[in-house]
Amino acid sequence: MKFRNMTGINLKIAIPTNRPQAVVNYINALAQLDSHGEAGRCFNPSDYDGLLLPGGWDVNPSRYGKDRIPQETVDDDLDALQFEALDRFLTAGKPVFGICRGHQLLNIAFGGTLIQHLPCAGNHTSLPTGEDNVHRTRIEQNSFIHLIYGAGCTVNSSHHQGVEHPGKGLRAVMYSEDGVIEALEHDSLPVWSVQWHPERMCFSHSRNDTADGSLVFRFFLEQCQKRK
């Protein structure tokens, strides 16, 4: 997929969080593409071009009908503000992109469920050195992620949960080698997500052993620009 020149695009992207310091990598990636990511608790969708749901702690499993397990770390305040932001932006018809926790939260919002602790979690969590694991993926044709990367690519991995059943209208379009759903897209709404961390695969965080994560941000910004 060939992307347009992002110079001067100057889009505003809302990033709902209660820990602004935790979303710096997302803001920096957007800035490299001449766009502004704004961290905060509450947003008016009319003031923004899109919503980015970032990585973070686990979503409380009570939101998808399950009990907590010892391996989970939840933040109910973060859940509340992000679900509220998502509802507002969906109602406004604005593009939404989820990353890691954001990918899982989107799935829950559409009625899907999560695997609370992957049997293969060791293959997907960070290494003892703090570096992300990496793995190959298989990508479905006729999907947003196939337009970007083709039939497959190598991505990073830093999570212990995964999508179990996709929510209403969501389609799984990318899988890890051990079957974990690595990307979702909605069949009619401007909604996309990935389980991995493209912000740690681009610009100053580029890696020789993974795909270029900036292409995900370019895709999202193009979709936001088209809907201005």
Model-identified regions with their sequence ranges:
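N-terminal beta1-alpha1 cap of cysteine-dependent amidohydrolase-like domains
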Residues: 1-97, 101, 108-109, 115, ...
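Conserved ATP-binding module of the ATP-grasp superfamily
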Residues: 149, 154
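Short catalytic/ligand-gating loop segments at beta-alpha or beta-beta junctions
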Residues: 155-160, 184
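Short, surface-exposed beta-strand/loop micro-motifs that present aromatic residues
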Residues: 180-187
